[in-house]
Amino acid sequence: MGVTKKPDLNDPVLRAKLAKGMGHNYYGEPAWPNDLLYIFPVVILGTIACNVGLAVLEPSMIGEPADPFATPLEILPEWYFFPVFQILRTVPNKLLGVLLMVSVPAGLLTVPFLENVNKFQNPFRRPVATTVFLIGTVVALWLGIGATLPIDKSLTLGLF
């Protein structure tokens, strides 16, 4: 069982395009040499120049200086671990918290198999994948913001 979608050769529009010699890439200009030799190096060097320029002009420190004699009241992880930290903080059973964290990638792995019957690539015509993405984004943002608040306000974000 593959996830790769095969073209519908019974579609008359696709058959007409194939008869004219127009496959999936019949438009635009080739990537070699235009993009690879001229545009990509300019973009890469421009990005490096912007980063170096900002580092020279604004050498800001990252965080507070370390003080081994003063421990903060609450130790928080890095920002990208906030949703996971919030799950572990609010779920009373640690095994259940670990299972919830494992269920996120397992659920994301099932989405292509649920959406395999749909032949469209447009996200607005793929309701299951779009719904999973939007709900997952909202839940991740909700958990991430809640992890920065005290435990009594973390699930409601202090709104309710």
Curated annotation (Swiss-Prot):
Listed GO biological process terms: photosynthetic electron transport chain
The UniProt record lists the keyword Endoplasmic reticulum = no
Its transmembrane ranges are 36-56, 95-115, 131-151
**HAMAP family per record:** Cytb6_f_subIV (MF_01344)
Keyword set includes Aminoacyl-tRNA synthetase: no
Q: Which organism is it from?
A: Eucalyptus globulus subsp. globulus (Tasmanian blue gum)
InterPro entries xref list: Cyt_b/b6_C, Cyt_b/b6_C_sf, Cyt_b6/f_cplx_suIV, Cytochrome_b_C_euk/bac
* Highest taxon above the source species: Eukaryota
Q: What is its main location?
A: plastid
Query: What GO molecular function annotation could you give as one example from this UniProt entry?
Result: oxidoreductase activity
Recite the UniProt keywords alphabetically.
Chloroplast, Electron transport, Membrane, Photosynthesis, Plastid, Thylakoid, Transmembrane, Transmembrane helix, Transport
**Subunit architecture:** The 4 large subunits of the cytochrome b6-f complex are cytochrome b6, subunit IV (17 kDa polypeptide, petD), cytochrome f and the Rieske protein, while the 4 small subunits are petG, petL, petM and petN. The complex functions as a dimer.
Q: Which GO terms describe its cellular component?
A: chloroplast thylakoid membrane
Topology versus the membrane:
Multi-pass membrane protein
Name its cellular compartments: Plastid, Chloroplast thylakoid membrane
Q: What is this protein called?
A: Cytochrome b6-f complex subunit 4
Q: Gene3D superfamilies annotated for this entry?
A: plastocyanin oxidoreductase, Single helix bin
Q: Which family does it belong to?
A: Belongs to the cytochrome b family. PetD subfamily.
What is the stated purpose of this protein?
A: Component of the cytochrome b6-f complex, which mediates electron transfer between photosystem II (PSII) and photosystem I (PSI), cyclic electron flow around PSI, and state transitions.
| Signal peptide feature range | none
Q: Which PANTHER family match?
A: CYTOCHROME B (PTHR19271:SF40)
